[in-house]
Amino acid sequence: MSARPTVASGRRPDRISGPALLKIAIVKLSSLGDVIHALPVAHALRGSRSGIHLTWIVEAREYALLAGHPDLDSVVPVDTRLWRRLIWRPAGARQVVGKVRRLRRRVRSARFDVAIDLQGLMKSGLLTAYTGAPIRIGFSADRCRERLNCLFTNRRVRPPASAVHVVDQYLSLLAPLGVTPGPVEFHVPLLPAAERRMEDFLGEQGVKSQDCLIAINPGAGRADKQWPVAHFRALADRLAQEPNARILLLWGPDEVHMARQIRDGLQARAILAPPTDLHELGALLRRTALMVANDTGPLHLAAALGTPSLGLYGPTRAERNGPYGRHCTGVQSPDGTMAGLAPDLAVDAARALLAARRDG
């Protein structure tokens, strides 16, 4: 039996019970991978009782992932990135103050009963406080990314030692509500039109239903999380030798040059993905037999969709931040650098995932 999370405030659980409509706000702003990792929290709350109205406060850039999500009743987008750009412009500070005030009025008028801060930052703490919820749950100070975040919460949780992965750490914040999560589930709805467009694209590339489509995403949000292009090329050449394998190179903003460098140096022909939005990317990932990527949003999107996924890790810990799921694994660099992660290690892990998929 795993240890129970510690409620640092010392209060007894505010159990989710009673006939009244309970209004809960989840505050998890970014990034894409982190928001995906928090999806099981929404699903656990939705299944905890009837009569819940669930709202998620999220950055505008990640809004598309949550819009129309079956576990949510509403989504409130905020654009703190825009606020940071505006603040340095003439009259920009006044604009930001106006936007913040309107947001505060909007969330305060919802009259939330509970707010759950999964981010642990000052900005997420402020938004949690803006809700005016009498129960405001967050991490204990020693587990917050910014310790002053705990000033804005009144139910503070220290995840148990058994909650190694960030998904399990997020779920531990439900303890003050007396919610015991069941099996972890990710719900990622995709638009049928996006799936049709991507099926048409793959058909144009000659991809057949029996082909083993292997997606490789070479981009990363930070330079120190970026596996060298030469390593990706070596990996792709080896995986292209798998039965019926087709290599699909994915890319995001400012990353197409890396995908082209990999493609142009390969012995086998690879498919360069078209520009995609979030739903189109998801449609491609749902179609693939394996996803290989750095610790980045597309990797975690693939895992959430049930696609076998291999994450490549250097400075971040695979056991905490790796792709979460049955047919998912992370390979850790022995020296903490991405360059120190040899292609052979990634090839062996990828082949093991492909073999497990073939064996069912």
Name each model feature, range by range.
Residues 1-360:
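Catalytic machinery of carbohydrate-active enzymes
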